[in-house]
Amino acid sequence: MRSKKMTGGLEKAPHRSLLYALGLSKDEVNRPLIGICNAANEIIPGHVHLHTITRAVKDGVRLAGGVPMEFPAIGVCDGLAMNHTGMRYSLPSREIIADSIEIMATAHPFDALVLIPNCDKIVPGMLMAALRLNIPTIVISGGPMLAGRKDGKKVDLITVFEGVGQVKTGNMTEDELTVLEQSACPTCGSCSGMFTANSMNCLSETIGLALPGNGTIPAVMAERTRLAKAAGSQIMTLLEKDIKPRDIVTEKSLKNAVTMDMALGCSTNTVLHLPAIFNEAGLKLDLTVFDEISRNTPNLCKLSPAGPDHIEDLNAAGGIQGVMAELSKTGRIELDPMTVTGKTVGENLKELNAGVKDHKIVRPVDDPYSTEGGIAVLFGNIAEDGCVVKQSAVAPEMMKRTCNAKVFNSEEEAVEAILGNQIVKGDAVVILYEGPKGGPGMREMLTPTSAIAGMGLGADVALITDGRFSGGTRGAAIGHVSPEAASGGAIGLVQTGDVIEIDIPGRSINVKLDEAEMEKRRAEFKPIEKEMPSAFLKRYSQNVTSASTGAIYKK
C-alpha cells in the first residue's frame, strides 16, 4: 500500500507514533488510509452542507474496511465574488486547489482519495489533482440546489441578477426585488440551473470519475447522502482493483465529455476547465475539437439560463445516464471507457436500464432543440485563436448580426454605461483587459450580461470580451477572446464606433476594417499595464496561459 511509505518498517516508528497521537489504533494504522478532501465552508451555499456528505463518505469507507482521514480545501463562491475585486481570485483558485491537494496527498501518502467539491472552480481543481496524482480516486459532489418559486414560476440566482436591470428600467419595484432575492435560493446546494458548478458536476459523472447520479441528485435529498456513503465504500473497491483516474480518463472519455457538454448546453466555462483537466492526463483538448463535436451533436436540453427547467427536472427525467443513453442511440457516446463503478459506460447504462423519462426536459435525439451543440467556437480578425459563445442561450435575432462597438477597459466601466442607459439596440459592448493575464484572473461578466438582459436588450445587444461568463449568462455573450488584449491581441485594436460582424452559424467574428487600418492600429497599440492588486495575482498574471489553452500555468 502507498501509505506504507509512512507506516511500514522499523524506520517509520516515529511516523506511527504521530498517527497514534490522532487516536488511531494499531489495527487502523495498518489498514488502507483514505484521504477525504472536504471543501466545506460556511460562506458558499453549495458547500455549507458538505460536512454531512463527508460524514456519509467516512461511514462508507469504514464499512468497507478503510480508515478515512479528512483534510480541507478552499473554495470561492462566484456569486458572492461577482462584480468586485474578489472575482479576480476565482479562476486562480482552481490551480491553488489542485496544487494543495497534490501537496497533502504526497506529503501524507494516502492509499486513495475521495474528493468532495460542489461549486465552480473547486470541481475542476479537484479533478486536475486526481489526474495529476493518479491514485485511486472518486468524486462525490454536494448536489444542486432546488429552484425557488415566485408567483407560481421557478426562479433562481440569475433571475435576481436580471431583476437588478428590471428595477433600473422600471419593470420591477425594489420591494418586488426584495421578495425575489429571498425566494430564489431556497436550499443549500450548487445554484440550480445548468450553470458552471452543475455543468462540471454533470461532466464529472460523464467522464466516469463520479458515480451515476452525482451530477443531478439534489443536495437536500437523502439519496444524495446514500450516494456519498456508496462513494466511500466504492473507493475501497477501486483501491483493491487498482483502478486509477488515468485508467478512466482517456481519449474516448474526452469525446464523451465534450459531446455531453454540447447536448446538455453547459456553461462556457467548461471550455476552460475540460482542457485543464485533460491536460493533467497528458491529453490535448483544443477549441477546434469543441467546435467539431458541437457541429455534430444535437442540443437536447434547455435548462436555465437557456430555458425554464432546472437540474432537479433533469434528475427526474433520467439524469446524466438518461441523456447518455439517448445519445448512444445514434452512436454518439463511447461505451468502452471505464468508470468508478468498476464497470464501463455501456455496462452502467445497461445495468441501470438508463433512459429518458420525460422528453419535455430532454428532447429525443432525432427531435432536438437544434442539430448543433450548446457552445460554438468563433474565429476572426479579432479572435485569431478563437472565442466562445453559448449559442443555445442566444436569441435568434443575434445569431447573425452587425453591431456598433462601444469599447470599455474594465467591467466596471461597462456596467456604469449599461445601467446609465448609454447602450442602445444594435450596440456591441466590448470589454477589454479582463483576460487571464490582463484582468488578472479572467473575471466573469455576469453583472453586465444580466443588466443587458434585465433591461430588455438581450435580443439586440452583444457583449464581447477577453474575460469570461457565468454559466448563468444568456444572450449574445462572446467571451474568452484570444489572444487577449493584455497579450497584444487584436481585440485590443477595436475602437468605439467600429462595426463588428457576428456570424455564429458561420463561426466567425470580425471587425470591419481593412488590413492597412489594422496594421496601422497594431503598430500604435500599447496594451494597458494595470497595477497589480496583490503579489499573488502578479505571479498568476506572469504564469498563466491563454484562455484558448484552458488558462493553465506555463510549463
Swiss-Prot record:
Domain of life: Bacteria
Residues annotated to bind Mg(2+): 78, 120-121, 444
Keywords: 2Fe-2S, Amino-acid biosynthesis, Branched-chain amino acid biosynthesis, Iron, Iron-sulfur, Lyase, Magnesium, Metal-binding
Reactions catalysed: (2R)-2,3-dihydroxy-3-methylbutanoate = 3-methyl-2-oxobutanoate + H2O; (2R,3R)-2,3-dihydroxy-3-methylpentanoate = (S)-3-methyl-2-oxopentanoate + H2O
SUPFAM superfamilies associated with the record: IlvD/EDD N-terminal domain-like (SSF143975), LeuD/IlvD-like (SSF52016)
Family indicated by similarity: Belongs to the IlvD/Edd family.
NCBIfam families hit by this protein: ilvD, PRK00911.1
Protein name listed in UniProt: Dihydroxy-acid dehydratase
Organism (species): Maridesulfovibrio salexigens (strain ATCC 14822 / DSM 2638 / NCIMB 8403 / VKM B-1763)
